[in-house]
């Protein structure tokens, strides 16, 4: 897989700037699958050096989201490891980065820049006015001796530390996902990027690279938006004399219409939202594995173990993936139908509790009743959040004029008086029913249709609305059995009374 000797070590290194985007989970998943397939280690590292964008609690959200999907880590903030700490701010406090920036300064490969933000803005404006499309900053201090830089810093002037990029030549690197072809960048197209901010905090370009080296990361898998920054990272590896990792930049995930990338700012794609809507973690795991990777171009439903066995970096596609909410929803339905009745009841229970239909904690009676109802919705459910609405009439009163419009009871080609007659006959027949099971109820009601010489559709439709308040509901005989004898007869009586006022 690479020329690097030793075990595969990969990492997912998110910034705690908000809820974890589903695209971030895809990046974590590909790294995790790589580690598990090749028998290596997966490391979680929190990169919190951006103080302005830091969101308290975001790191915990990231960990919780990853664990929910089924991604665990061999080393990380909460599990430790031989190369900790695994939070960059903690590494900064321990002075881990300082020797390395000093090494670059001493070698003349980095320099202290005293250019202020205001001066930088003026330079950009002047370049734009002069028709220069790509402003590339190279500070005058790059030619100063280090002693002069230190004297200037000692005077109290704020400064950043910038990479001293070569003015000539070219920087080359390979990307595994792009066929391993060499990517060539002319050094005069680069600029002197900031490595250390004026606060002393290292930026991503510097901190992640030092961490990757010290943590012995062998493969850097990240989004393709980092391709333009990779020449700087390659220069730093070469300046330090460190072996480069294998670079594998993952394809973007586009919106369904193909117009732009999926965005956590514009699209409802926070991982927590999928959990709240009732997507199974197995679904998210499977679907995200297919966002830029394919086993054989045909097989889509794969278990966790199958994905581990089949995953290879060579089958990651360079072309963008496209997000398809309908396909994701369909896949969730498939995984829901793989669950047993008891398993689905357990998954649905929190949604029923949040809707106020079942107590928290649920009693054994409530659990048993929910399990009895699950078969009625098992084949129809696509998202777990749909369950409370589909099952509400089993738990709540159905009242004509409140739950439904009494006019909805009237079948096509019938009037109110005719419908009253149908429902009265049904009420009378069912009130004599002692065996309240679906087969017995079906026998009774079909016999009633023959007796009344009516088609089942109008009668069953009117009963369905009376019992559920809806024209579409689970199978009628199962519904009657689930609602129970007393409540069913009461609802039929209420429907008859409401219709009599219309007749």
UniProtKB/Swiss-Prot annotation:
Major location (coarse): cytoplasm
This protein's name: Glutamate--tRNA ligase
Sequence similarity: Belongs to the class-I aminoacyl-tRNA synthetase family. Glutamate--tRNA ligase type 1 subfamily.
Signal peptide extent: none
Enzyme class: ligase
Cellular compartments per GO CC: cytosol
EC numbers, comma separated: 6.1.1.17
PANTHER family named in the record: GLUTAMATE--TRNA LIGASE, GLUTAMATE--TRNA LIGASE, MITOCHONDRIAL-RELATED
Keywords noted in UniProt: Aminoacyl-tRNA synthetase, ATP-binding, Cytoplasm, Ligase, Nucleotide-binding, Protein biosynthesis
Superkingdom in the source lineage: Bacteria
Protein's GO biological process: glutamyl-tRNA aminoacylation
Organism this protein belongs to: Chloroflexus aurantiacus (strain ATCC 29366 / DSM 635 / J-10-fl)
A GO molecular-function descriptor: tRNA binding
Subunit annotation: Monomer.
CDD domains named in the record: GluRS_core
Motif range ('KMSKS' region): 261-265
Motif ('HIGH' region): 14-24
Cellular localization per UniProt: Cytoplasm
